[in-house]
């Protein structure tokens, strides 16, 4: 049995000039995940369920657990001293860590502390998403927004934690995707899936079909394609949608499938956040042999212009993402 800590140290040689900072940073995220795991499991017994009454910069009401998870992860990252600053879906602006150690830290972290938190009240899986970049401003200075507005192709590491029937941490440093299952009796994450890859063919699609009338024409055509009978391509595909990006992505990663969150009339630029959700999941997808697109472009090639930028998002088995891109090209909206 190999623990996450042992595995990270073992793989440290994958990085040129590695001196342990990234290892310590990932350990901080691991600690934050353990704390969130513990408190999610007793959320119904203490007053951390429901809405907080506070709205974020996008005007969305934040859940109590969103804010709680944000504070716990932020504290864990700050305490290790390997992070110069963070950007979070729950923070209006970047958070700059102070002190000499932070100013000399090489990395910045972007995160969605608790994806799918509206599902907590009904005991449905939720997750944490994180993304790590090497800063571009000089060491010895405070980080700026420019350190966070880098294309996803510049990510050093990315991953997620899914809190479900078991808690799993899945991550990549650009050398494959690896998954670890939490053993609460020992308090450690143990390697359970090494070098995870999408199956070559998928047969599941994940989308909120209740919004069908609002979807672009190409996406509507693709959904109909998924539902058609065709033995050669093993259609119809199965529709599976949880409403938590982490949970839907995780299932599709292991079973084969595509997750779709297109632009709609309500969200013409898409709803998911490029920096906190799309980029890290796209990095994981590509490292697992999959693909991620905004319908026209590779997600990891997009240069972000603002912290809370949104994007349409299609991610999963490569051939399925290719298909939806083809439908979007062939059936453009006027």
Swiss-Prot record:
<comment type="subunit">
    <text>Homotetramer.</text>
</comment>
<dbReference type="InterPro" id="IPR028343">
    <property type="entry name" value="FBPtase"/>
</dbReference>
<dbReference type="GO" id="GO:0005829">
    <property type="term" value="C:cytosol"/>
</dbReference>
<dbReference type="InterPro" id="IPR000146">
    <property type="entry name" value="FBPase_class-1"/>
</dbReference>
<protein>
    <recommendedName>
        <fullName>Fructose-1,6-bisphosphatase class 1</fullName>
        <ecNumber>3.1.3.11</ecNumber>
    </recommendedName>
</protein>
<dbReference type="Pfam" id="PF18913">
    <property type="entry name" value="FBPase_C"/>
</dbReference>
<dbReference type="GO" id="GO:0030388">
    <property type="term" value="P:fructose 1,6-bisphosphate metabolic process"/>
</dbReference>
<feature type="binding site">
    <location>
        <position position="271"/>
    </location>
    <ligand>
        <name>substrate</name>
    </ligand>
</feature>
<comment type="similarity">
    <text>Belongs to the FBPase class 1 family.</text>
</comment>
<feature type="binding site">
    <location>
        <begin position="259"/>
        <end position="261"/>
    </location>
    <ligand>
        <name>substrate</name>
    </ligand>
</feature>
<dbReference type="GO" id="GO:0042132">
    <property type="term" value="F:fructose 1,6-bisphosphate 1-phosphatase activity"/>
</dbReference>
<keyword id="KW-0963">Cytoplasm</keyword>
<feature type="binding site">
    <location>
        <position position="241"/>
    </location>
    <ligand>
        <name>substrate</name>
    </ligand>
</feature>
<dbReference type="InterPro" id="IPR020548">
    <property type="entry name" value="Fructose_bisphosphatase_AS"/>
</dbReference>
<dbReference type="Pfam" id="PF00316">
    <property type="entry name" value="FBPase"/>
</dbReference>
<dbReference type="GO" id="GO:0000287">
    <property type="term" value="F:magnesium ion binding"/>
</dbReference>
<feature type="binding site">
    <location>
        <begin position="115"/>
        <end position="118"/>
    </location>
    <ligand>
        <name>substrate</name>
    </ligand>
</feature>
<feature type="binding site">
    <location>
        <position position="114"/>
    </location>
    <ligand>
        <name>Mg(2+) 1</name>
    </ligand>
</feature>
<feature type="binding site">
    <location>
        <position position="115"/>
    </location>
    <ligand>
        <name>Mg(2+) 2</name>
    </ligand>
</feature>
<dbReference type="InterPro" id="IPR044015">
    <property type="entry name" value="FBPase_C_dom"/>
</dbReference>
<feature type="binding site">
    <location>
        <position position="277"/>
    </location>
    <ligand>
        <name>Mg(2+) 2</name>
    </ligand>
</feature>
<dbReference type="GO" id="GO:0005986">
    <property type="term" value="P:sucrose biosynthetic process"/>
</dbReference>
<feature type="binding site">
    <location>
        <position position="89"/>
    </location>
    <ligand>
        <name>Mg(2+) 1</name>
    </ligand>
</feature>
<feature type="binding site">
    <location>
        <position position="112"/>
    </location>
    <ligand>
        <name>Mg(2+) 2</name>
    </ligand>
</feature>
<dbReference type="GO" id="GO:0006094">
    <property type="term" value="P:gluconeogenesis"/>
</dbReference>
<keyword id="KW-0378">Hydrolase</keyword>
<keyword id="KW-0479">Metal-binding</keyword>
<comment type="pathway">
    <text>Carbohydrate biosynthesis; gluconeogenesis.</text>
</comment>
<feature type="binding site">
    <location>
        <position position="208"/>
    </location>
    <ligand>
        <name>substrate</name>
    </ligand>
</feature>
<keyword id="KW-0119">Carbohydrate metabolism</keyword>
<dbReference type="GO" id="GO:0006002">
    <property type="term" value="P:fructose 6-phosphate metabolic process"/>
</dbReference>
<dbReference type="GO" id="GO:0006000">
    <property type="term" value="P:fructose metabolic process"/>
</dbReference>
<feature type="binding site">
    <location>
        <position position="112"/>
    </location>
    <ligand>
        <name>Mg(2+) 1</name>
    </ligand>
</feature>
<dbReference type="InterPro" id="IPR033391">
    <property type="entry name" value="FBPase_N"/>
</dbReference>
<keyword id="KW-0460">Magnesium</keyword>
């Amino acid at each position: 049995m190999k623990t996450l800590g042992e595995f990270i140290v073992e793989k440290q040689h994958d990085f040129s000039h590695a001196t342990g900072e990234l290892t310590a940073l990932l350990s901080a995220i691991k600690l934050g995940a353990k704390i969130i795991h513990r408190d999610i499991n007793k959320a119904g017994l203490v007053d951390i369920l429901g809405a907080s009454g506070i709205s974020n910069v996008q005007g969305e009401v934040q859940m109590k657990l969103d804010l709680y998870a944000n504070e716990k992860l932020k504290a864990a990252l700050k305490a290790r001293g390997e992070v110069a600053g963070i950007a979070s879906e729950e923070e209006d602006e970047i958070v700059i860590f102070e002190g000499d150690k932070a100013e000399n830290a090489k990395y910045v972290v972007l995160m969605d502390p608790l994806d799918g938190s509206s599902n907590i009240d009904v005991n449905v899986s939720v997750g944490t998403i994180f993304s790590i970049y090497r800063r571009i401003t000089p060491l010895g200075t405070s980080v700026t927004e420019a350190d966070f507005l880098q294309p996803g192709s510049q990510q050093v590491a990315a991953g997620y934690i899914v809190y479900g029937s078991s808690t799993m941490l899945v991550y990549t440093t650009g050398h494959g995707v690896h998954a670890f299952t939490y053993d609460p009796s020992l308090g450690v994450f143990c390697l359970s899936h090494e070098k995870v890859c999408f199956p070559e063919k998928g047969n599941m699609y994940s989308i909120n079909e209740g919004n069908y009338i609002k979807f672009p024409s190409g996406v509507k055509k693709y959904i109909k394609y998924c539902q058609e009978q065709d033995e050669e391509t093993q259609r119809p595909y199965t529709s599976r949608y949880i409403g938590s990006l982490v949970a839907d992505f995780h299932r599709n990663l292991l079973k084969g499938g595509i997750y779709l969150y297109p632009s709609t009339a309500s969200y013409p630029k898409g709803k998911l956040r490029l920096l906190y959700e799309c980029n890290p999941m796209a990095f994981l997808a590509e490292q697992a042999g999959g693909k991620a697109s905004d319908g026209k472009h590779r997600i990891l090639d997009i240069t972000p212009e603002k912290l809370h930028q949104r994007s349409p998002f299609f991610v999963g088995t490569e051939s399925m993402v290719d298909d939806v891109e083809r439908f979007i090209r062939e059936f453009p909206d006027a």
